[in-house]
Swiss-Prot record:
GO terms for biological process: regulation of translational fidelity; tRNA threonylcarbamoyladenosine modification. One of its GO terms (cellular component) is cytoplasm. Pfam families: Sua5_yciO_yrdC (PF01300). InterPro entries: DHBP_synth_RibB-like_a/b_dom, Sua5-like_dom, TC-AMP_synthase, TC-AMP_synthase_SUA5. This is Threonylcarbamoyl-AMP synthase. The keyword Transferase applies. Signal peptide: none annotated. It comes from Halorhodospira halophila (strain DSM 244 / SL1) (Ectothiorhodospira halophila (strain DSM 244 / SL1)). GO terms for molecular function: ATP binding; double-stranded RNA binding; L-threonylcarbamoyladenylate synthase; tRNA binding. Keywords: ATP-binding, Cytoplasm, Nucleotide-binding, Nucleotidyltransferase, Transferase, tRNA processing. Its EC number is 2.7.7.87. It comes from the Bacteria. Residues 10-191 form the YrdC-like domain.
Amino acid sequence: MNECPPGTRPFRVRHAAAELRQGGVVAYPTEAVWGLGCDPRNADAVARLLALKGRPERQGLILIAAESRQLARYLAPLPAEWAETIQASWPGPMTWVLPASTRAPRWVSGGRDTLAVRVTAHPVAAALCSAFGGALVSTSANPSARRPARSVAEVRRYFGTRIDALVPGRLGGLERPTPIRDGRSGAYLRR
């Protein structure tokens, strides 16, 4: 279980996790920008998150986790050589596009046979995944075509009371969103 980092009130993380379990959408800091998250198994929660952003389902979403076992249900078994490379990059700011399992919800994968996933090293995001007990949908906290939020004030300006909880904390220090790599080829899809 990931502990709450210093300066983060554990009750805020527990409250956000409770909101997630009830189908809520929450905001939290990540490696580079503020994120919006929800329970990936809850189609209504994902639809609400997508509506907040004005983002189509077909684009797919990223899942973050505190540890790789939280992602296992969503991913097809990986060849050993892939698993070694991927595991060596986690926890950390590397998102991988990997073959999805048949249990991966289409509303998260965008209807593709792959899924973008990351085991986060950000202490607040990891603590939230641990308190929730599983992986979360994670997307930048901004309406489509607007720049991602880099402060609590921007999150509030974009979404006001339309989100169910906000877990305070600092961003992880990256200037740009996490890189995304294709697990099959190793190619960078986003640097």
